[in-house]
Amino acid sequence: MHAKKLDKIATAVLYSIAGIIVAILASLILYILVRGLPHISWSFLTGKSSSYQAGGGIGIQLYNSFFLLVITLIISVPLSMGAGIFLAEYAKKGPVTNFVRTCIEILSSLPSVVVGLFGYLIFVVQFEYGFSIISGALALTVFNLPQMTRNVEDSLKHVHHTQREAGLALGIARWETVVHVVIPEALPGIVTGVVLASGRIFGEAAALIYTAGQSAPALDWSNWNILSVTSPISIFRQAETLAVHIWKVNSEGTIPDGTIVSAGSAAVLLIFILIFDFGARKLGSYLHKKLTAA
């Protein structure tokens, strides 16, 4: 068969495969949005959830999801930055570095439910944090740390070596070169990775069932005592997130309009995850143009 004809056939096959993937993804998104959007209202987004009566909302669960996301990022971003900088800038090739990379690969391949059980045994039981936001945040840190570390490392390695050489040629210390030259250059990629990880954290459920709990106690918005279980800023209270709420309503829910609540909650969750994903790309492009004057 003629080479040009083979090339056209191969191109058509590849386009068809890509089209099928896009069609499946678009169908899934449209199905969730079409089922859920009609049930979303302001009262649904801000109201309290109901255990037995119809008409409950997702206000507390939505707040818990964002609060848990913030706490997780506060813990995981510095750790991933430090690990990524070490691997990209300071680690020498050898058995120790290879062992660290192997550990990162193993952690990144663990199922979230296994990480959840690990978090339950260590943070909930052993450290006696109980079902709490801090237990969930620590478990999600273990879950996302490998991905975020690799993102930081890859972003730093994409910075051209001439940038480092220029800093060292000016007599700047190595750590100052990393902080003032390399990291600003790699910042768009790092920020994009963090925002994408935020979407993954926001939609996680399995790991949180065993660590953050499955209940959402009423919050006293005038109580700013961080140790109180009714305080909205307490990290030692149980916190059912939106993803866990969807799972609970579908598996154990007793409310009469469980299907409606689940559909609306799934649509809200999907919308925020899409915002994180598209926002990461826009923010990365903006920072790249801003910092590189491109």
Regions found by a protein language model. Name each.
Residues 105-141:
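Generic hydrophobic transmembrane alpha-helix motif, especially the helices
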Residues 174-214:
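Transmembrane alpha-helices
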Residues 52, 208-269:
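Interhelical loop and adjacent transmembrane-helix boundary motif
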Residues 1-18, 281-294:
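Transmembrane alpha-helical segments of polytopic membrane transport and secretion proteins
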Residues 72-104, 125, 280-289:
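Transmembrane-helix boundary motif in ABC transporter permease subunits
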Residues 63, 67-75, 79, 83, ...:
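Hydrophobic alpha-helical transmembrane segments of multipass integral membrane proteins
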Residues 1-13, 32-74, 93, 248-259:
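Periplasmic/extracellular loop-to-transmembrane helix junction in inner-membrane transport proteins
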